[in-house]
UniProtKB/Swiss-Prot annotation:
The lineage of its organism: Bacteria, Bacillati, Bacillota, Clostridia, Peptostreptococcales. One of its GO terms (biological process) is ribosomal small subunit biogenesis. Keywords: Ribonucleoprotein, Ribosomal protein, RNA-binding, rRNA-binding. PANTHER family: 30S 40S RIBOSOMAL PROTEIN, SMALL RIBOSOMAL SUBUNIT PROTEIN US4M. This is Small ribosomal subunit protein uS4A. GO terms for molecular function: rRNA binding; structural constituent of ribosome. One of the primary rRNA binding proteins, it binds directly to 16S rRNA where it nucleates assembly of the body of the 30S subunit. It holds the Pfam family Ribosomal_S4.
């Protein structure tokens, strides 16, 4: 599957915010955007005022990069969100947030979404007792996500979960000893810590 090949720290600088793409490094002084808050490139320090379309595009790019989703799949999520009842922008973020790779990351079973995605692909997780190796798999309220039995002997997962303890969002619970978590409810907009104007994404795709 196609993925971003650009240095991920440049992506954060381009969007002007931390996208938490490098795991633990993002929480240290080594984070690139902590050192250089301007965009990469020769003219990065002279940001131009964006047009309305430019603002809409930037918000879309933020969301895509935050969750590590490429354009074709992102558009499919929008089409699904647009058909659901409720507010389209919030529906879109909820779909992205309930991807298995993101949930594994939120539970602390990956230091970044990229690492969690790789671990999902390699078959390290189960959903309701069945192995799922599709990062885009959407979890539902009541689902139990666990580290597969064959992987529980790895000290890596316990260390990751211990480090993430206390940072689990309200819509999830995690049992560090059992290396499993549960989706207690679908996330509301207040549960999603992405600083983004999702209404601008809706406007962009609605043209």
């Amino acid at each position: 599957m196609a993925r971003y090949t650009e240095a991920v720290c440049r992506l954060c600088r381009r969007e002007g915010m931390k996208l938490y793409l490098k795991g633990d490094r993002c929480y240290t002084d080594k984070c690139a955007i902590s050192k250089r808050t301007y965009a990469p490139g020769q003219h990065g320090q002279s940001r131009k005022k964006l047009s309305n379309y430019g603002l809409q595009l930037r918000e879309k790019q933020k969301a895509k990069r935050f969750y590590g989703v490429l354009e074709s799949q992102f558009r499919k999520y929008f089409e699904i969100a647009d058909k659901q009842a409720g507010i389209t922008g919030e529906n879109l973020l909820r779909l992205l947030e309930t991807r298995l790779d993101n949930v594994a990351y939120r539970l602390g079973f990956g230091s970044s979404r990229a690492e969690a995605r790789q671990l999902v692909v390699h078959g390290h997780f189960t959903v309701n007792g069945k192995k799922v190796d599709i990062p885009s798999y959407l979890v539902s309220a009541g689902d139990t996500i666990a580290v597969a039995e064959k992987s529980k002997s790895s000290a890596k997962f316990k260390a990751l979960a211990e480090n993430a303890k206390g940072n689990t969002p309200n819509w999830l619970t995690v049992d560090v000893e059992k290396l499993e978590g549960k989706v207690v409810a679908l996330p509301s907009r207040e549960d999603i810590d992405l600083e983004i104007a999702e209404n601008l994404i809706v406007e962009l795709y609605s043209k």
